[in-house]
Structures are given as C-alpha cells and as structure tokens.
Amino acid sequence: MIFANVSVDREQLTILSQLLLTVFPGCVIHQSCDPLRTMARLSTQKVDAVFTDADTYPDLMQLLDRHDAKTSVYLLCRHDAPPPEETGGVRSVIMYPITRQKIQAALQTVPREIMEVI
C-alpha cells in the first residue's frame, strides 16, 4: 500500500509513519509538510490513502477538489470531530492520540479491492 502523510507537525508525521509501518509492514509512505507537494505526488502515482491534520486539511481538500482526486482522505483530529458535512470527502476521522487500533479501524473503510492487495 502507498500512503501520503501531510502535516505541518513533523513529530506527528514521524509517529504516524511508524504506526502505518507497524500496521502495514512494507508499505510506502510519502511524508510532506506541503499540500502542493502531496498533490504533485497524487498526480503521478496512485496513493491508497492520505492522512492529514486539521491545520493542513483545508488547503489539501481545496487542492483535491480542484484536481478532482478520488483518493481517500483521513483527518487526524486533535479535538472533537467535525460534523460530517464539514469534512467533505474525508472517509474517517481519527482522534488524537493516534493509535494502531484507530488506524486499523479507519482503514477498514478502504474499498475491498485495495484491502485485497495487502
């Protein structure tokens, strides 16, 4: 599986990448603090899921909407989860602190054809 992690919080990027590698050994992870770099990656390579945080989310979703990207986006949320109508294309909200169980639960919503590749 290929994931993209987008966050202005470098420490959070590292923690999330370590957890994803634990849940999906051998997965490929692209980390970035810049939504534009992530969009460039999405346009050249299929990414199974994007993880982002509330600080980066508005910019990322604006870019995704502009590119009509269908990639699943998971919002990492420090506070109360926003209502569904505010999360747009977000598949799931993962509340802090992020744990392996929360990632596994969120990724169960990934389409079956992707899960079969794992």
Q: What residue ranges belong to the model's regions?
A:
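The C-terminal output helix
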Residues: 108-118
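As written
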Residues: 85-94
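Conserved acidic carboxylate
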Residues: 6-10, 77
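Acidic, metal-coordinating helix/loop segments flanking the phosphotransfer/catalytic sites
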Residues: 31-49
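Two-component/phosphorelay signaling modules centered on CheY-like receiver
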Residues: 10-30
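C-terminal output helix
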Residues: 98-107
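Short amphipathic alpha-helix used as the core "switch/output" element in two-component signaling
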Residues: 40, 56-70
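A short, hydrophobic beta-strand element within the central beta-sheet of small alpha/beta folds
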Residues: 70-83
